[in-house]
């Protein structure tokens, strides 16, 4: 059974490698990630995960396709992926001393979309306050890490972990963009051995 990761994310590729080694392919989907009118962050992450997997599954009906998407939500607003370093600086500064909720959607699709498993991991991340996170620290982080195209501009797999006071999650890998614990459960339901 072919296994395909529907993503262009290097971090998701690295995470999937942890449980599948080289037994998967990568095919990045092209979808519109714009939120629908009044769409909440949980539904957005679930919808985008499913759309990514379905897009790739249409042309790869013999494969199990993995789609995942992450949405950050802080103080009443969805934090879109930063397009430039200035946006990233503003996003990190916005989260100082606050709680950000990360919704990491996961979808597995096979048979061209006839069979689907999907779900969302909700993680709460508590950022350190301004006594710890200075403007200079944020600027240095943005310059060194270049956190573009990641939810909330916080690369928790890298230097972004320095901003964090505490995390509440059932799946630590979800915070990096691909919930491996849930993925292993989904694969098992379809009798797919991840590290075969």
Regions found by a protein language model. Give the residues of each.
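N-terminal beta1-alpha1 ligand-phosphate binding loop
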Residues: 1-21
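Anionic-ligand binding patches
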Residues: 3, 40-196
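Cofactor-binding loop segments of dinucleotide-utilizing enzymes, especially the Rossmann-like FAD-
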Residues: 8, 29, 111
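Glycine-rich, flexible loop segments associated with nucleotide phosphate handling
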Residues: 9, 25, 136-138
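Flexible, glycine-rich phosphate/dinucleotide-binding loops
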Residues: 12, 33-35, 115
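Short loop/helix-cap segments at secondary-structure boundaries that form the rim of catalytic
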Residues: 15-18, 36, 58-59
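Glycine-centered loop/turn motif at secondary-structure junctions
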Residues: 20-23, 191
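A short beta-strand-loop structural module common to alpha/beta enzyme folds
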Residues: 24-35
């Amino acid at each position: 059974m072919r296994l395909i990761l529907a993503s262009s994310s290097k971090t998701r590729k690295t995470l999937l490698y942890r449980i599948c080694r080289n037994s998967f392919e990568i095919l990045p989907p092209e979808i519109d990630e714009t939120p629908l009118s009044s769409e909440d962050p949980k539904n957005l992450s679930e919808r985008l995960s499913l759309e990514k997997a379905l897009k790739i599954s249409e042309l790869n009906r013999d494969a199990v396709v993995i789609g995942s998407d992450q949405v950050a939500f802080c103080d009443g607003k969805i934090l879109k992926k930063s397009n430039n370093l200035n946006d990233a600086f503003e996003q990190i500064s916005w989260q100082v001393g606050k709680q950000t909720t990360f919704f990491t959607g996961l979808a597995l699709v096979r048979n061209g979309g006839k069979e689907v498993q999907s779900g969302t991991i909700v993680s709460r991340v508590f950022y350190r306050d301004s006594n710890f996170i200075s403007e200079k620290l944020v600027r240095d982080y943005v310059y060194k890490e270049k956190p573009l195209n990641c939810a909330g501009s916080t690369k928790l797999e890298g230097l972004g972990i320095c901003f964090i006071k505490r995390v509440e999650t059932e799946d630590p890998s979800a915070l990096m963009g691909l919930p491996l614990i849930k993925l292993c459960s989904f694969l098992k339901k379809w009798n797919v051995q991840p590290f075969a």
